Amino acid sequence: DPAAAVLIAPMLGLKTPIGAGMAERLARLMRGLGDPARPAWKGHERPGARLDRQKLLTSDRSRYEDEQYWYEQVPEIKLGPPSWSWLAEAFASTRLQRADPRLATLAIPILMLVAEADGLVDSRAAIGVAGLLPNAQLVRFGRESAHEILREADPVRGRALAAIDAFLTAEAP
């Protein structure tokens, strides 16, 4: 068994403007209307996010540009948008995860780093799960951090790395 776990921007729910329940029903409907493997939208992480993709991921332009560099160098690593099937399963699995009574029995020390301004995953869901875990530490980041906490500007990244280092030193020396 692992001595400890660190979860960074954990996907315990997906961020959606229409609510998780409605979004799950919509994804299931769309999955059933055609090829379930077809892309749910064009682009990358979210519909309409093409111009705001960097803001969804990190406020650090140089770290974002580094990612773009690698996409150009190794195009096969670039992910496309999720399929309707992926979305339906993601909504269902995260809903079931959040409701799992075994969360309250996890003895392993867990550190959760959560970006409250995350535009991809539901930070409220992650914070809620952290409250269910008997041995969890929660480190919250505000507007200064987007989804990719470890690819953020140095002050955010440094705070995250310091929290991880202190946690692992204490829990898994």
Role assignments for model-derived ranges:
Residues 82-102:
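Active-site nucleophile elbow and catalytic-triad environment of alpha/beta-hydrolase enzymes
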Residues 103-107, 131-134:
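Short, conserved loop/helix-junction motifs that constitute active-site signature segments
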Residues 106, 112-114, 118:
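Short beta-strand/loop motif that positions the catalytic acidic residue
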Residues 119-125:
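Conserved alpha/beta-hydrolase "acid-adjacent" motif
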Residues 136-173:
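Catalytic active-site module of serine/aspartate enzymes centered on a nucleophile-bearing elbow/loop
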